[in-house]
Amino acid sequence: MILAVIGINHETASVETREQLAFSSKQVKELVQKLIEGQPIKEASVLSTCNRTEVHFTVNTGQIEAGKNHIMTYLSDFSDLDPREYVDHLYFITDQEAVSHIFKVTAGLNSLVTGETEILGQVKKAYQLSDEAGGVDSIFHGLYQQALRTGKRVHRETGINDNAASVSYASVELATKIFGSLQNRRALIIGAGKMSELAARHLYSNGVKDVIVINRTIERAKNLADKFGGLYASYDQLSEWLNEIDIVITSTGAPHFVIKEEQIKRAMKSRKYSPMFLIDIAVPRDVEPSVNNQDNAYLYTIDDLEAVVESNMQERQEEARNAELIISEEVAEFMVWYKTRDVVPLISALREKAEDVRKMELEKYHKKLKNLSPKEQEAVDKLTKSIVNKILKEPVLRIKEFAVEDKSELYMATLAQLFDLEDEVIPKDGEEHSSSKEVESVTQSSTERGHHESDFHN
């Protein structure tokens, strides 16, 4: 079984390309359902944010090319893009490198703004949507549980998000660089999601005079505005507010432009061409790019935030190195679990066989032991269990070590023959054998630090 990642991000593709491969929650679920229909994809999850679209998947060994082609077919179907338009922007990684990548993404190390916290919620949502679509089984439950724990641990144990901790923060920082000060400035926020809330928080902390929230759902606009004592309005009032504000920060999930050039043209005339700065952090973009053609209208996209991010990068380098160490440790732990999954049935069968022999031998001596007191019989039972466990301890450890070193198949077959366990399921290339219950048992034993709580439901 191969665990892999295929995708694009802000480092490999421009916003123009990324927005065409950005998917709504509904599309994510539909895409996952299509990906897992039939062969060769076993498990699949889709992470789609403003900075990346990735498909995480498992596929039988030997079918990796078929899996990639399967994914690209559906990416094209859902985006109406010819694969030739984006294939050069794709990255493809497998197994430990893929796990490390997912953990780094979740911790915010691969984000436009290193250490941003929004990605944790986005990964959690991708996990939930993909699970609801039927794309998540034992491997991905283990993967995302540990990825989310790792992300939280990185933020808890390092100061990586002490500076520009989000795209929203960077957008407000850009506005501050433009104006010098936000005192007496009026800002319009379009959208009422998490990024919009963070933007509002940062605007107020930088002394902005007023924040007006516009959202498709007026109730959500009101709820967000009420948190900060701001104003709210409906989309019908957008053109009216464009006549009065200095800064627009927009982050909706709309599949079309929310602000068009013609609107800005009319607004600039009405406001006698006083400067307006628009910061579009949505993917797909909310603002028609030709807005930049209007005098004194200055449009910035999410890709333009890179310069702002770079200014704080030096301060975060040391914390990023500390985060890398944490991630390396967590990846190593996950890989032990991942590689030992297939030996769980054999280990269980070996223990059951030994337990059957122990009970059978005790039964033979039942008459001789019946004169013992209950306490003495309990002591004999514990003694025989202890002997069995001690005999099995080293073989079980060796089986797991061989699995981690990718040497398990021959040794497992030999062990099965030696102990007459051939009827037990021995993993063959590309087969999945560990039950969810068995895998969970191994997961719990490999996470003895007490952090096996469910991040999915928290």
Swiss-Prot record:
Keywords: NADP, Oxidoreductase, Porphyrin biosynthesis. GO terms for molecular function: glutamyl-tRNA reductase activity; NADP binding. It catalyses: (S)-4-amino-5-oxopentanoate + tRNA(Glu) + NADP(+) = L-glutamyl-tRNA(Glu) + NADPH + H(+). InterPro entries: 4pyrrol_synth_GluRdtase (IPR000343), 4pyrrol_synth_GluRdtase_dimer (IPR015896), 4pyrrol_synth_GluRdtase_N (IPR015895), GluRdtase_dimer_dom_sf (IPR036453), GluRdtase_N_sf (IPR036343), NAD(P)-bd_dom_sf (IPR036291), Shikm_DH/Glu-tRNA_Rdtase (IPR006151). Residues 426-440, 448-458 have a biased composition (Basic and acidic residues). Substrate binds at T49, C50, N51, R52, S111, E116, T117, E118, Q122. The active site is at C50. One of its GO terms (biological process) is protoporphyrinogen IX biosynthetic process from glutamate. Possesses an unusual extended V-shaped dimeric structure with each monomer consisting of three distinct domains arranged along a curved 'spinal' alpha-helix. The N-terminal catalytic domain specifically recognizes the glutamate moiety of the substrate. The second domain is the NADPH-binding domain, and the third C-terminal domain is responsible for dimerization. Catalyzes the NADPH-dependent reduction of glutamyl-tRNA(Glu) to glutamate 1-semialdehyde (GSA). This is Glutamyl-tRNA reductase. It comes from Natranaerobius thermophilus (strain ATCC BAA-1301 / DSM 18059 / JW/NM-WN-LF).
